[in-house]
Amino acid sequence: MLSRLRRALRFQRDGIIRSASGLKSVRVQAAVAMLLALNVVLSYFGSFYLSPEIKVSTSFLALSSTAYLFGPIPAALSGALTDVIQYFLRPAGPYFPGYTVSGILGGLIYGACLYRREGKALLVGIPLSKLLINLLVNIVLNTLWLHLLNGAPFFAMLPARALKNAVLFPFEAALMYALTLFLAKNRSRILPGL
């Protein structure tokens, strides 16, 4: 058991180093920038609000694609930059760095679960990453950020946000699975030379 844990941690460390060194390539930078732009576009045009505190969005697809193709470091940078760019394009109140932290954590979680995964590991990584992000980032952290920003009661918002994430989880995981399979099968055509 301990040897499996060591192998998993070594795999994660190597994946982080590999994904960070991949950012030295201009082609990788350009591809990550295009996925970052797609993330920003999807956050505006691929989302809607059920209430002021509950947003449904498809922008997670661009971030998970960045993580699958390029790893946790480019995905974390993309998550952070997406939040900052969104703020400058359409500010809704003062800038709050908590959402940037959420973007970074989302990219790191997707990257840890999806980068360089194939077969059964990918099949487990997709729902695991979405579950971790829904629980830790969407339900806990983002609810905390809303509480700190708006003064809305944390525990009063929690049930509605948890219900939204629970209902959307199977659909989001299925969309991620379909997109990741498409990327896996067509990677050489989509990103020639990478």
Residue ranges and their predicted role:
Residues M1-L194:
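Loop-helix junctions at membrane interfaces
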